[in-house]
Every structure is written in C-alpha cells, then in structure tokens.
A protein has these predicted regions:
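Glycine-rich beta-strand-to-loop/alpha-helix junction loops that act as flexible
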Residues: 7, 132-135
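Anion-binding (especially nucleotide phosphate/pyrophosphate-binding) glycine-rich loop
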Residues: 72-133
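Glycine-rich nucleotide/cofactor/substrate-binding loop typically near the N-terminus or early
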Residues: 25-99
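Extreme N-terminal starter segment of soluble prokaryotic enzymes
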Residues: 1-3
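N-terminal beta1-alpha1 ligand-phosphate binding loop
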Residues: 5-23
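Residue-level detector of conserved catalytic or cofactor/ligand-binding positions
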Residues: 138-142
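Glycine-/small-residue-rich active-site loops that bind phosphorylated ligands and cofactors
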Residues: 11-12, 44, 137
C-alpha cells in the first residue's frame, strides 16, 4: 500500500512537514509495510517559503527584522539560486506573530518585509518572489 501526503500547514499550529510526519507515523502503525511519500504544500501564507525550498533544494537565509509591533523578530527567506529568492510576508509581518488583541492596523507595521527585501537585494538577488498570505494587510474588521 502507498500513501501520498500533501497537506498545507494548520494556521499557527503545525507545519506542512510536521503534518506529513504525523500522518506517516499513523499510517505505519496501521499498515507497517506501507510506503509513505510526502510533499510540502502551501497556499501563499506561512510555510510557503519552506515548501518551495523543499521542492527545489534551496536554502534558508536567516535574519532579524523589525516585527509587526516594532520589536526585533527572527525570520528567514529562501535562496533558490544565485539570482532568485523567495520570502513570505507572514515571516516578518504576519498575523501568526500577533495575538488577537494585537491585530490593530493602526499600530502594526510591515516594515520588516521591506527589510527582508533590502537584505535579499544586498545579497545580490534580483528576482524576488513574495508570498503575501497571512500578512498584516489581510486584517479586516468583522
């Protein structure tokens, strides 16, 4: 028996890779001889950079930027090749970085995303893809 697991992350809780690990463990418990394959997926929000890096065997570039509340925030973007990079706004300016009560567009910033872009340009990347899912620009009033 063969299984293919391709799940997006669960917002703010489990990554696509972790979900695949858990599903593989569960499948192996029920079907010890099964073959499990997984593919990281994402919808343009958190986890997008990791999914793309996994697919193309890219590498993470870590940095610290100004977070959504103007405090230092550790994040990363991805190197696809010498000219191309990928990043997600959620890493520097995303909803997962804020509690429900902190989600106030009058008090938050996306400045850190600009810092990620500047860092990528300083590293020589000229083709930069930016995933905007789960970013602060998606805050809406009920």
């Amino acid at each position: 028996m063969k299984f293919l697991f391709a799940s997006d992350s669960f917002k703010g809780t489990l990554s696509s890779a972790r979900i695949a690990e858990l599903l593989t463990t569960a499948a192996k418990e029920s079907f010890p001889d099964c073959i499990c394959t997984s593919v990281e997926t994402a919808d343009g929000g958190e986890g997008t950079t990791d999914a793309v890096l996994c697919a193309v065997k890219g590498e993470r570039i870590p940095l610290t930027v100004c977070g959504p509340l103007w405090k230092p925030t550790d994040c990363f973007y991805g190197k696809l090749d010498e000219n191309r990079a990928i990043m997600e706004m959620a890493a520097a300016s995303g909803l997962p970085l804020l509690s429900e009560t902190e989600r106030n567009p009058a008090k938050t910033t996306t400045y850190g995303t600009g810092e990620m872009i500047r860092d990528a340009l300083n590293h020589g990347f000229r083709d930069i893809s930016i995933a905007i899912g789960l970013s602060l620009i998606h805050i809406s009033e009920p």
